[in-house]
Amino acid sequence: MGKKIVFTGGGTVGHVTLNLILIPKFIKDGWEVHYIGDKNGIEHEQINQSGLDITFHSIATGKLRRYFSWQNMLDVFKVGVGVLQSIAIIAKLRPQALFSKGGFVSVPPVVAARLLKVPVFVHESDLSMGLANKIAYKFATIMYTTFEQSKDLIKTKHIGAVTKVMDCKKSFENTDLTSIKEAFDPNLKTLLFIGGSAGAKVFNDFITQTPELEEKYNVINISGDSSLNRLKKNLYRVDYVTDLYQPLMNLADVVVTRGGSNTIFELVAMKKLHLIIPLGREASRGDQLENAAYFEEKGYALQLPESELNINTLEKQINLLISNSESYEKNMSQSSEIKSQDEFYQLLIDDMAKVTKG
């Protein structure tokens, strides 16, 4: 029987990125790779865009909430259906392991794998677990964590951050990049705004409503909204980038980002000056606020509350970052929190082998 592994995770790009780092390595080593997710979710879109040899299985999924809502009744039913669908899929595949990156879509496959005695490996990126991974922990064989967790969580293994930033930077030049450089003023600093798969609208609206921003800076806006796409003097707006991602990062003097740990650790790995504008508690469980406080305390970045975002506060924080750039870059270069992709892959393979033999 050939080696098989099932991946799951979705809802945001951050719940898919690590999977897409690991999957090519498994494929290269001869594994048959399957993915359980929602056909209407961003995970399906990302898998399709990857062009990798992955079999995608769609299941029903529902959002789990900490508060009362009548929608919970329907969503609990959907989760139950998702568990039954996942049991059928995993029982048929008989994989050696399941790897979960979290998000609500991951709960049914994790539960199903455990019921079928398939080893479950889970990854948690944030300082505090989301509800989906709190549930997943109960069914996990091992949970890998980016940050140190309570010693009471005996199944956790702290590994640090695994990012999509490679150890070497490839030189890259194409027509788009040349045009962008020609549109930019070499005498101005360049800001790159990136909001992730959630929360980009605040940045998009701020840039649209603050024309004076383009007088003070060259502005790159990875917006997630194709209707905003344009290139003009001192401004480049694009909905989504793949090959251009690293070159655009290289162009930026400062990156303005949300508070997701995946993106921030990429910036730390690149030693890129960054300003964090986290999602508040009214729009999230507060994990981005915790992340922002952590990275600021480490001396990697500055933060700015979304409610205080305007041209004056932004300019003040940007100036502080640039005037103290040596200190921030030194702190990032000395970080011991980044784990190489190959190191984590080998650790996962070794742990899977131990569990299988055990």
Swiss-Prot record:
GO biological process, one term: cell division
Topology in the lipid bilayer: Peripheral membrane protein
Pathway annotation from the record: Cell wall biogenesis; peptidoglycan biosynthesis
The keyword Protein biosynthesis is annotated on this UniProt entry: no
InterPro entries: GlcNAc_MurG (IPR006009), Glyco_trans_28_C (IPR007235), GlycoTrans_28_N (IPR004276)
Compartmental location: Cell membrane
GO CC terms: plasma membrane
UniProt keyword list: Cell cycle, Cell division, Cell membrane, Cell shape, Cell wall biogenesis/degradation, Glycosyltransferase, Membrane, Peptidoglycan synthesis, Transferase
PANTHER family: UDP-N-ACETYLGLUCOSAMINE--N-ACETYLMURAMYL-(PENTAPEPTIDE) PYROPHOSPHORYL-UNDECAPRENOL N-ACETYLGLUCOSAMINE TRANSFERASE, UDP-N-ACETYLGLUCOSAMINE--N-ACETYLMURAMYL-(PENTAPEPTIDE) PYROPHOSPHORYL-UNDECAPRENOL N-ACETYLGLUCOSAMINE TRANSFERASE 1
Family the UniProt entry places it in: Belongs to the glycosyltransferase 28 family. MurG subfamily.
Function noted in UniProt: Cell wall formation. Catalyzes the transfer of a GlcNAc subunit on undecaprenyl-pyrophosphoryl-MurNAc-pentapeptide (lipid intermediate I) to form undecaprenyl-pyrophosphoryl-MurNAc-(pentapeptide)GlcNAc (lipid intermediate II).
Name of the molecule in the record: UDP-N-acetylglucosamine--N-acetylmuramyl-(pentapeptide) pyrophosphoryl-undecaprenol N-acetylglucosamine transferase
Lineage: Bacteria, Bacillati, Bacillota, Bacilli, Lactobacillales
